Amino acid sequence: PYRFIRSGRVNPGAYPLNMTRKERKMKWNPEEYKEWWTPKWYEAIAKGMFVKRDLKDGQMSRDMTLFVDDDGKAYHIYSSEENLTLHIAELTDDYLQHSGRYIRIFPGGHNEAPALFKKDNMYWMITSGCTGWDPNEARMFSASSIWGPWKQHPNPCRGQNSEKTFGGQSTFVLELPENRFIFMADVWKPKSLMYSGHIWLPIQFDEQGVPFIEWTDEVNLSAQSEWKLVWSDEFNTDGLPDTTVWSYDNGFARNEEAQWYQKGNAY
């Protein structure tokens, strides 16, 4: 059975690693910023007004996910600062506490529902905007280090209804064998939450290695679904294929059938 350990806010007394010395020394009078969404208010948010407000007792943590890196380090990614700014916070080696190391991502960007994954030493994160139960356009960010700097990309979704993330909201990215990834999204039904559901869609990558997501009515999670057979003109010969390029096998079913294959061409 699960055992309750504790509850609490995140990293009390600790400043974000990417908050400047000048920002850490700034003082804010909340009475001057009662009106939200003004340019003056946005500037204060970007410079860490809410971080300073919550510094003593710890940062707000909501709409979150967890990510474990290749080296076993775990990270808590969550919406903070009144749901206005994402934080990435490192956990201790036993995963039971925060280490005190964390960063802010796009302060005031109003991102939530983070889903993080890593491919070819690049970190990718898909999020949503904050529109309550209603779906909205997905956002995507990347960084070569989990500590940033993070770069924003266009909506990763393509095709019909992509501006609404196909009716869903990002929740997790599932990594499969052979460097394949599944984008998972919640489909909320606020009038009757018991009928809420999920979307699972394969993440594809363009020639530059940038992820994108297209709608498909059916997803085959079998590794064999990724196999491809590519014809080579080298087979157009009266004799045997070029043995300096092609390898030979007697067949996987021990039927002595000659099988020729080329690494990287037929797999």
Per-range role (PLM):
Residues 1-267:
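Carbohydrate-active catalytic/glycan-binding domains of CAZyme proteins
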